[in-house]
Amino acid sequence: MGRTLYDKVWDDHVVDQQEDGTCLIYIDRHLVHEVTSPQAFEGLRNAGRKVRRPDCTLATVDHNIPTTPRKNFKNVSTFIQEADSRTQCETLEHNVKEFGLTYFGMDDSRQGIVHVIGPEQGFTLPGCTVNCGDSHTSTHGAFGALAFGIGTSEVEHVLATQTLLQKKSKNMRVKVDGKLAPGVTSKDIVLHIIGVIGTAGGTGCVIEFCGSAFEQMSMEARMSVCNMSIEAGARAGMIAPDETTFEYIRGRPLAPTGAEWDKAVEYWRSLRSDPDAKYDVDVFIDAADIAPTLTWGTSPQDVVAITGTTPDPSTVSDPIRRQAMERALDYIGLKPNTPMQEVKIDKVFIGSCTNSRIEDLRAAAAIAKGRHVADWVYAMVVPGSGLVKKQAEQEGLDRIFKEAGFDWREAGCSMCLGMNPDQLKPGERCASTSNRNFEGRQGAGGRTHLMSPAMAAAAAVTGYFTDVRKLTPAQQDRPASPTPKKIETELEPPVEDHAKAADQADIVTDAPATGASPPSPAPSDAAGMPKFTTLRGYAAPLDIANVDTDMIIPKQFLKTIKRTGLGTALFYNIRFDGATGEENPDFVLNQEPYRQSRILVCTGPNFGCGSSREHAPWAFNDFGIRSIIAPSFADIFFNNCFKNGMLPITLPQDKVEMLAEHAKQKAELEVDLVNQVVRYPGGEVPFDVEPFRKHCLVNGLDDIGLTMQKADLIEAFEAKRSQTWPWLDGKDYAGKATKFTPVATNTAKKQKLDW
């Protein structure tokens, strides 16, 4: 039987396979940043372990850094004002020096967002495996790479062993054929796809995007699509490499050359899915059905055409979906049936790992040219890397933006997640080219609407969500739309002064303290986990669908270099009043006996969707909750739970609702992992768990220690890899799996990469 693109890449990276199907796969490329790596390096240090393949590892700072001008930059210690952010960046600089890793610091023109710098350096190549402690690692799948985000425990695992323990996902194909309408971009396509299949539509799968719509895309457009495959619940997204791919890679600093290039291209051509390959899930979409699209709510699946209106929850029969829709409309400050083009905005963000590349900036500049940002709008453009910024300035794009009233910034993640100074204030509405519109994602109380760079630029110059086709040359002879009326959304008055708005964009505050109980013991950083056999206690009931990682632990609590102390941050935005820090008495964890909960029962599906950050399970562990029961889980969160000695249990909807009713009656539940049952007063419910994961939990085993027992298999694979795919090794690797070549952070831009 034929194989898919995913099958082929997976098969070429299996180091070992266990009886239950768990595989040890080799990781070719590892990207590291400041937020999800400190605890991983600490684990290596405590266990006396080294980084196995420095030549396959690349580090940079992106999430926490300011995007203000760097003309007076000396070092991160003096430049980054916010203490926790500064500590994370300083810690990364210390770690890359100690462990001998290549690092693009803030004084290096190559610094930028991890998922921008990997491709532009030629670090990302077709057919390779790519990991990063960031869920949008799926971006690199645009090259035909198997790329997926991992948690901090797995970051440590890759650093130590250059491998991961994984179960193979299902194959899913999303095919988009036909002629695209004018004004429709890759961002519109992927938002439309997510709207069709939902944020859990790809759960348990790797999506292969195919069809004429993707074949005609540039590499940068393909990256935007694969970037957001995680928002559809998929483990990864992939597009088969072709001539467009090869031309993009050719000549990049880390791309193969000469005979190696020819051999590489021959291999890359072989990766395309076979004609008779079988897929577990097939989705077909007519390109003609896709219009310029944006989000209306607080989930990437809450999408609507720019010509459409917000939905009406009263027409939805499913109570969980109706409740989620009502909650989203309430948070976003819009009423049912509101025309999207009548919604007034406050800010515009053009940037993020989804849309901060040169083509994105060109598209936005084409709309901005000759126009000006609306008087009440603050608009910012944040290039994805120093090299993108430099190229844009060479093309004069910066002048177009500045003349139009946009703020032209330095490279970084910026307002995508508001961990840095670039944030929304409560009530502010933002047209954003980023990838997530969760509650509080861009700042507490901020209202995020996702869209393409061209659509964001159109919103900036009109002050309202606008059909970009009205502003493009081919559409200028169309009759003008009626003057949009302002929608009353209970916003705070918008900032009128642009200088003042820019200053406010740089305000960041520390996480507020709370009076919650002290944290419970957490797993050791060095090795091993507490054993999990049985767990008895109160179970907190929660009736929310699509509980995302930003809801579980808001971004302001991610700026830590430890795994502990996060119990007070669990569900902070709905557990506490953001302004006063006072408890919300209506939230279940603030009620007795649920303050002592050891189990959580959530009746809504897709629990833990969103980021790969391991801070979410750390927060649960620190609070004292070690088991979560739900109808379904997002893949990365599900995996991260096991890495932290926690047990996520998937049960049918009716069983979850039954257990939730017992929880609401304040009855204790018992999770018996050994016998694989959940006991409740008068009965029990069986559950499934993978044998290897059960074995590790029951015995408190350390994945890294287990993997290191297979050193001979890893070494044999590396020898085969060097012979078969030599372009994947660093230039001076020569079989030396622990070679270190430190790169001093203050001279990185002057040194030639020793790969």
Curated annotation (Swiss-Prot):
* UniProt-listed GO biological process terms: L-leucine biosynthetic process
S-S bridge residues? none
InterPro entries assigned: 3-IsopropMal_deHydase_lsu (IPR004430), 3-IsopropMal_deHydase_ssu (IPR004431), 3-IsopropMal_deHydtase_ssu/lsu (IPR012235), Acnase/IPM_dHydase_lsu_aba_1/3 (IPR015931), Acoase/IPM_deHydtase_lsu_aba (IPR001030), Aconitase/3IPM_dehydase_swvl (IPR015928), Aconitase_4Fe-4S_BS (IPR018136), Aconitase_4Fe-4S_dom (IPR036008)
Region Disordered: start and end of each range? 427-446, 471-493, 510-529
Positions with biased composition (Low complexity):
510-528
The protein's annotated pathway: Amino-acid biosynthesis; L-leucine biosynthesis; L-leucine from 3-methyl-2-oxobutanoate: step 2/4
So which cofactors does this thing need? [4Fe-4S] cluster
> Cofactor note, please?
Binds 1 [4Fe-4S] cluster per subunit.
GO CC, sorted alphabetically, is:
3-isopropylmalate dehydratase complex
Give the family this protein belongs to, as stated in its UniProt record: Belongs to the aconitase/IPM isomerase family.
Q: What does this protein do?
A: Catalyzes the isomerization between 2-isopropylmalate and 3-isopropylmalate, via the formation of 2-isopropylmaleate.
Q: What is the protein named?
A: 3-isopropylmalate dehydratase
Q: What does UniProt list as this organism's lineage?
A: Eukaryota, Fungi, Fungi incertae sedis, Mucoromycota, Mucoromycotina
Q: Which gene encodes it?
A: LEUA
